Amino acid sequence: MERPNLAHVTPDVLEYIEYLEMQLWQKPAKVEPVAAATEPSEPPTSINIISISQSGVAKRTPRHLYGRQHRAGMGVFDLDTPEEDPPAFLVAADITDRLLLFTNFGRVFPISVSQVKETEVRGKGESILTGLRFMNNERLVAVLPGMGGEDVLLASQRGWVRTIRKSFFGAQLIPGMSFHETKEGGELRAACWASGSGDVLMVTRQGKGVRFNQRQIPGRNGCLGTRVDQGDDVVAIAAVTDESGVFMVGNDGKGTIRQMAGVLANKAPGAGAKVLMKVDELVGAAAVKPDQDIFIISRLGKLIRFPAEEIPTKEGVVQGVNCMALRADVAAACTISEFVAESALK
């Protein structure tokens, strides 16, 4: 558009127009964010990414159908659910494996991965809770693949922790079997697989955490793992060592990888938690290796996959870096899985 003839304009108005023109000229152009380009898919794999809503509506999609983006990309639309039933869980598991569904009452229900409806990346799921005898006010709080270690670690909302041997989750597992008493630390909140000989990291919604050795957890009854502040609660538990990194992500899509070398283990469970990440609300935490991929899903059903190595590792407290571009949306859950390059199969 050409500049019109301003000869008839008074000097003071002309001066003001020229001032505005100069401001616009000096102001950098605003670049609208666009979806990050995806890398070619990995070779076909039997590993599936399972997306699950708050009410238990789920779908599975082969992992290789999710293209890799770069950190801070916009992701792709994944699980299609109503606004009132947003995605809440994300898990990677082999098609031949089972899923362990943990409820807030500490009960466990096993189902086969193959039972979950398979769809394209964007798809509507079906309830995986159909036929399961849930009690009043019972709901899903954690989902694990059927295999992943020697023990399962359980954490309650008020910081109680217990360890359960993997043999209890074998073929003889009775659907609905209970492994947690809500009178001990409140309802169940998180679960993870562990090696049986490493350390435990418990993380709260306010980004605080505590680390101690798993062998210090007494028997099946467990103990207080950490003292949780009023208004806070446990959201994740992870099995770690000095060499481990733990990916932590907030609802704003910012995340970090905390190196456990910078988080000293307490001499015993039960200590107060210390700040690990500056965050308004932490939504997930999981142990991660540099050669693995991170998957994050939002409440609007968008999912991003990117290499863990794109996140700077830190030994100190940080606010995190942008992991997922969110517009009127919040991050809901995350999971970690491998990336198999074509060259690895040759």
Which residues are covered by each model-predicted region?
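Short, structured "edge-of-domain" segments at secondary-structure transitions
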Residues: M1-K346
